Structures are given as C-alpha cells and as structure tokens.
Amino acid sequence: MEAPVISGIAHDRSQDKITIVGVPDVPGAAARIFAIVAGTDTNIDMIVQDVSAEGTGLTNISFTCPDGDSAGARAALEAARGELGFKSLHFNPDIGKLSLVGAGMRSHPGVSAKLFNALSQAGINIHMISTSEIRISVVVDDAVLDEAVRAVHSAFGLDAQTAEAVVYGGTGR
C-alpha cells in the first residue's frame, strides 16, 4: 500500500530565531559560529545561510533554537563578535514553525509548491524553509501560525472528513 503524500502537519511555538548579519563568507566561519553556540548547550533546529551579497564577501546566517536556549546563544555570539567579525545580531522570539510530514513526498513532485501557494494565498510570509525527504518545515510569524496551519490543512485535504470506520463484531463462536 502506498503511503499518503502528507500524513500530518505539526507546529511549534517554542523556538526563537537568531540571525547573524554580515558574517565574513570564508571557510570555517559557520564552523566557528556553531562551535560557540554548541558551547552554550543550545540545540539548533533549522539553519539557513544566505548567498553572499555580490562584492561584499559577507553573508547572513539564521538559525532557530528552543526559546529557553536563545539568551545563552546570543550572549556567547555577542561576546565573540570581534573574533567572528559579523556586523549585527538580530533576535526574533515571535516565530512559529509549521512542518508538513509524509513519506509520500519523496515520490510526489509539487508538494512544496502546493505548501508555498497555500501560505501565499493566505497572505502569510515565509521567513525560513528547511526540507528533508519526508518533511518540509517553514518558519512564519507566530501571530499567523494558526492561520497557516488551517490554510495548509485545507490545501492538502487534511480537514476533510475521513472515511467511516466500520467494525463488525461477532459472538466468537
């Protein structure tokens, strides 16, 4: 039996987003940044690195982490600003993560397009995107997370009535 394309939608409000702006785009920069963050016992969930702005040699790196870990990560990064050479640190505690989950995504092109279209039609901006073979996650403003979940549920038919389950019982004889 083939797995359904999408088996569920999950959401998470317990994360913060940290963006390190103006990171020198050189080998080892990300390694050093995440070694510093690891030293604070911060668990990283999603990571996005922008393409370097042409001619600047600088990039931005954003990541999400549990909201209880973000203060330590921010403090450690600020303390290492001179060593790391970044321009500024931005912090956003008002984010939510929506994840679309399903083993069937591997063999069905267009799932991400459908997800992004559903969010677009609802007027919801995406801040970060992360994918794997069985999951697509997006970060959106926390204020619209519930609306995002409803829009995606509707787009993938997860809000439809499921088939009726019929149970036949016997006497056991």
What feature does the model see in each segment?
Residues 1-173:
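A conserved regulatory-domain signal marking ACT and ACT-like small-molecule sensing domains
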